[in-house]
């Protein structure tokens, strides 16, 4: 298309999140709509609709988002044909699969157990639709109709877990929907975190961005991971905000001969990183390689 459409989380002083929509003709300068396109309505999301990720399949937009009730961060689903009028389908994992909506101990062999984040792969694999989801560890689920999802494993058997001694040693989380590369592999941007020393004997969490590769012939496993993060907190916006030291990627689009990766900075602002789409990605923070905040997301 001739525009980039960005769905983003924003909140006012009450820190109750809504999802807004903004458009851009160049991928860097955005005009946002005055009213949110998705707001809390139900008990499971009464304190926020967060972390939007959208996939378009056969003219329908499938939006996964986090419903937050200040106890549990649930993976939820909504659909639309015009990006403005949405039908909410509620939490994705319920009933027998509600184990993914519990908040397990922070430090377990497999991290935390919120369903939270999710991305839908825009093409079928092995005759089914696939979703990757999870915060703490990454899991997979399949569907016949894109609305009803069945996890492929239990909470104790994730497909991807934190790597000891690495930038994601305490937490891994879904980033962007996978893209199919010329080599036939799916590449997905991810988020990782580790604890670092804080003040007065406490600790802080440092979020960085990674990548994993998945073979569509074996979509239930990670084939390879990037050993070093491609994006780390560096700028003032990355290191100062509602939650400090966070670069957190959620959107990826190919536009104008570039890959544009949209990421959050310390839960306060949004920015974009770019890579040349004609070759191997070498990420920079804006078209000229300099830091660039493109949209305030604080209400």
Language model features with spans:
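Beta-rich carbohydrate-recognition and catalytic domains
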Residues: 1-47, 56-170, 179-242, 256-299
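ATP/pyrophosphate-binding catalytic subdomain of soluble kinases
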Residues: 173
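Low-complexity, glycine/alanine/valine/leucine- and proline-rich hydrophobic stretches
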Residues: 244-247
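Electrostatic interaction modules used in gene-expression and signaling proteins
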Residues: 252-254
